[in-house]
């Protein structure tokens, strides 16, 4: 069986989940559900990164010990993912004992291989990003995102990259990491690799909240090293767990390991992480999906200091869970930073969900109930105009998958919106009320069957996004189980007999 292992970043547990976390995690969940629809066995890993200076200082400011602080925030992430209908298979925490033991074993292994040496780190450090900087603006003392930098000089353990510089340059240059969008690979080469890849400091001396170096308890393992390995400590890679072979370290040509990340952490995932795996003789992920930032209406990165942060709760309150999932996925592009505001998402919600997908279901349901007493059997379409729509529907099934596999979600969705729009015009042209009045039942049934076929295809294809709504729609029309399956979607004859429910509620109420 084809298998796909999907990860979100292990989010830093210094606060509650925000819209950026929600978008990445919804994206991961939709990809997982899409893979399962297409015959894969899939696994989704989420979690929280719980060590480091930032955590320790924030906990102290609240008069909490670090573990209590991260317990509270990890629980907030878990609850949010359950609210957003995220079908995660495991929530890993870097404070889990099984994770800590494997990280220490890995650090010891690198030391035993003489890949780690002791020296002195001198440069700038960003507490917010948990990131070292060799080069930085000494006048502003701000990191690339805009957080304050502090000067640091301390002894620590480094990992040598001298033997891997050519390897990582070739690996990225030949697109062997399959970084999407491709522009991210160019950014990595131009901004980091071409400037010389410095050895990386793997420990901090003055950080107490973290995993200790096994052979030097005065040093704490760098939070990024700790966090990256959570992707495979979850699978017990150091403990002989068969899940590591099943999901990651195997020779299956159809093996897929997909990391979802935001662009500011691409360097850690697409340079350092592959190097770590290479040095340990572990197979690389098959794809890195690096999306842009979510910015406000003025193009500014969302931050608490600017008071422009949108919480997932705000969106859920306005648009519901499925509406939030849909609007974020439809609006966000992976290859650029995306402007986002409640007003922008409201336009999408009203236009796409309330007026198009939702209204088409209501209209179809109402016509079958009014004109056919709630019953409709399979129809052979002979009318030319309706035949064209049916062809368009069949073609959309293939095209939808093409766009979805390319992560062009807005294009995939627009295919279906076009069908709904064309069919809406045909309904107005055919005037079903007159067909009923004139007892032209053959044409009326063909029209309504085409409408039902459109409902079926749209909601089966959109099931990974509109999870709850799709289930409601299938129940409204009493679709047979086979008619709700993606692998049977080309077969319209599965709509043998439609018997609609007695009543329906509006699927997507307009938001004013």
Swiss-Prot record:
Keywords: Aminoacyl-tRNA synthetase, ATP-binding, Cytoplasm, Ligase, Metal-binding, Nucleotide-binding, Protein biosynthesis, Zinc. Its EC number is 6.1.1.10. Gene3D superfamilies: 2.170.220.10, HUPs (3.40.50.620), Isoleucyl-tRNA Synthetase, Domain 1 (1.10.730.10). Its cofactor is Zn(2+). It catalyses: tRNA(Met) + L-methionine + ATP = L-methionyl-tRNA(Met) + AMP + diphosphate. A motif ('HIGH' region) lies at residues 11-21. It is found in: Cytoplasm. It comes from the Bacteria. Binds 1 zinc ion per subunit. It is an enzyme of class 6 (ligase). HAMAP family: Met_tRNA_synth_type2. Monomer. PANTHER family: METHIONINE--TRNA LIGASE, MITOCHONDRIAL, METHIONYL-TRNA SYNTHETASE. This is Methionine--tRNA ligase.
